[in-house]
């Protein structure tokens, strides 16, 4: 009995023992690199897939069928179209059959099925089940061919006609409403909202930042668009409690309002890795051994329907590129701006990115190089401008700003000819 209690109330259950922790973190998530116990690294399962679907299965749900039937409208909206069409057809056919049986029983009890009887029938021209079924269809769909009609002989028949008319209106309203709600769901809008394949960590304005890119493939806007992010990882509390997926908010500018974006062209979302960030103690070496997932969420209202949509994606630790930046996609033309989505997922390496954590960088344990680093964004913009000028017949300049044999990864050690640079926002 004691052994049973020991297994039952142990700090980490046998199932949790099977989940190998890549790191056992302290403080705000990752420690400083000295307090970690590294185990055999494994590729964790995604909690949120790249297409936004949650990788979760519910089991042992009590009274699942009753709970789904209690919220039948939401159930009809969420199910697949094939099942929705089955419910659509069954709702009408079963109601026609039910009331057809009722009118047939009324005719049977009143003796209307006897052809030799000359008394007034409850429902004229209803002398078989087929005729009763057709009368039910005509009543509920308000067709009224004129051959079959209810009489004042039987009050029950009159009541059933009124009752079927009301039931038919309810079925029409429910089924048509569910179909329209399903068609108007903004879920398909997510097909034209994209996240970059990889997130990056690089310096921006003198601070180490986590960045990812979002884009809108439609010209219609996403109203009140805003972003948020969470870091998911396993951890053990100071009391010994094991939390399989601890959710930690990642600040993307909620307090200052910069989490709200104007998503006309692709935008890079920036998370400044400061002392409040769960990535504050994470270095390049720690990133290679880390086991976590960053879930990114984009929310907004569809301009056409004013319905709220949510687009999701996630990045595992091995999908975050340290020391990279995104290639520019927005270029200024003569009378408009051009967005090149072929560059949307592309990145380039920034050689001078510090490999230490943001904490070490803030404590001046890593000295940043003062050498002028090569600005790839400006080079791309100038190259694009030269290509456009050559297409328009403008002769190319014979002078070059950069020697052709220079390795781009070693630009920090090569003196560049001074020239006016342009920010990516200006590109």
Swiss-Prot record:
A motif (PDZ-binding) lies at residues 425-427. S-nitrosylation increases the open probability and inward rectifying currents. Highly expressed in the ventricle and skeletal muscle, moderately in cerebrum and cerebellum. Only low levels are detected in kidney or lung. Activated by phosphatidylinositol 4,5 biphosphate (PtdIns(4,5)P2). Residues 107-128, 148-156 are extracellular. Keywords: Cell membrane, Ion channel, Ion transport, Membrane, Potassium, Potassium transport, S-nitrosylation, Transmembrane, Transmembrane helix, Transport, Voltage-gated channel. One of its GO terms (cellular component) is membrane. Its main location: membrane. The chain crosses the membrane at residues 82-106, 157-178. It comes from the Eukaryota. Residues 384-427 are annotated as: Disordered. SUPFAM superfamilies: E set domains, Voltage-gated potassium channels. It is a multi-pass membrane protein. The modification S-nitrosocysteine is found at residue 76. A motif (Selectivity filter) lies at residues 142-147. Pfam families: IRK, IRK_C, IRK_N. GO terms for molecular function: identical protein binding; inward rectifier potassium channel activity; phosphatidylinositol-4,5-bisphosphate binding; voltage-gated potassium channel activity involved in cardiac muscle cell action potential repolarization. Residues 181-208 are annotated as: Polyphosphoinositide (PIP2)-binding. Residues 129-140, 141-147 dip into the membrane without crossing it. It is found in: Cell membrane; Cell membrane, Sarcolemma, T-tubule. The keyword Transmembrane applies. Homotetramer. Homomultimeric and heteromultimeric association with KCNJ4/Kir2.3. Can form heteromeric channels with Kir2.6/KCNJ18. Associates, via its PDZ-recognition domain, with a complex containing LIN7A, LIN7B, LIN7C, DLG1, CASK and APBA1. Inward rectifier potassium channels are characterized by a greater tendency to allow potassium to flow into the cell rather than out of it. Their voltage dependence is regulated by the concentration of extracellular potassium; as external potassium is raised, the voltage range of the channel opening shifts to more positive voltages. The inward rectification is mainly due to the blockage of outward current by internal magnesium. Can be blocked by extracellular barium and cesium. Probably participates in establishing action potential waveform and excitability of neuronal and muscle tissues. Belongs to the inward rectifier-type potassium channel (TC 1.A.2.1) family. KCNJ2 subfamily. This is Inward rectifier potassium channel 2.
């Amino acid at each position: 009995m004691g052994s049973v209690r020991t297994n039952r109330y142990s700090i980490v259950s046998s199932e949790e023992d099977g989940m190998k922790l890549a790191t056992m973190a302290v403080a705000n998530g990752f420690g400083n690199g000295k307090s970690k116990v590294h185990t055999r690294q494994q590729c964790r399962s995604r909690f949120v897939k790249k297409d936004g679907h949650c990788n979760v299965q519910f089991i042992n749900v009590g009274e699942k069928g009753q709970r789904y039937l209690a919220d039948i409208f939401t159930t009809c909206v969420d199910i697949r179209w094939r099942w929705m069409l089955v419910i659509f057809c069954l709702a009408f056919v079963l109601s026609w059959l039910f009331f057809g049986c009722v009118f047939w029983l009324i005719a049977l009890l009143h003796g209307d099925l006897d052809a030799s009887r000359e008394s007034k029938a409850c429902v004229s021209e209803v002398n078989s089940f087929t005729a009763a079924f057709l009368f039910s269809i005509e009543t509920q769909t308000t067709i009224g061919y004129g051959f079959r009609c209810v009489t004042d002989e039987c009050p029950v028949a009159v009541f059933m006609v009124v009752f079927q008319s009301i039931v038919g209106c309810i079925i029409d309203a429910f089924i048509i409403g569910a179909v329209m709600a399903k068609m108007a769901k903004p879920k398909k809008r997510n097909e034209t909202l994209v996240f970059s394949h990889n997130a990056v960590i690089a310096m921006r304005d003198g601070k180490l930042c986590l960045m990812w890119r979002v884009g809108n493939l439609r010209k219609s806007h996403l109203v009140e668009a805003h972003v948020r992010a969470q870091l998911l990882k396993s951890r053990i509390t100071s009391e010994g409690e094991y939390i399989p997926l601890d959710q930690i908010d990642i600040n993307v500018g909620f307090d200052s309002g910069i989490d709200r974006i104007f998503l006309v062209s692709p935008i890079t979302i920036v998370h400044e890795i400061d002392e409040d960030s769960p990535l504050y103690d994470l270095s390049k070496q720690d990133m290679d051994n880390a086991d976590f997932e960053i879930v990114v969420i984009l929310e907004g209202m569809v301009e056409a329907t004013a319905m709220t949509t949510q687009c999701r994606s996630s990045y595992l630790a091995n999908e975050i590129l340290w020391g990279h930046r995104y290639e520019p996609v927005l270029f200024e033309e003569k009378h408009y701006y051009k967005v090149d989505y072929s560059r949307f997922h592309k990145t380039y390496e920034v050689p001078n990115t510090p490999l230490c954590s943001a904490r070490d960088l803030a404590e001046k344990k890593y000295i940043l190089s003062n050498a002028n680093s090569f600005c790839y964004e400006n080079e791309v913009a100038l190259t694009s401008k030269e290509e456009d000028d050559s297409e328009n017949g403008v002769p190319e300049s014979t002078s070059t700003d950069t020697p052709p044999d220079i390795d781009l990864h070693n630009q920090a050690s090569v003196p560049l000819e001074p020239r006016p640079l342009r920010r990516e926002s200006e590109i």
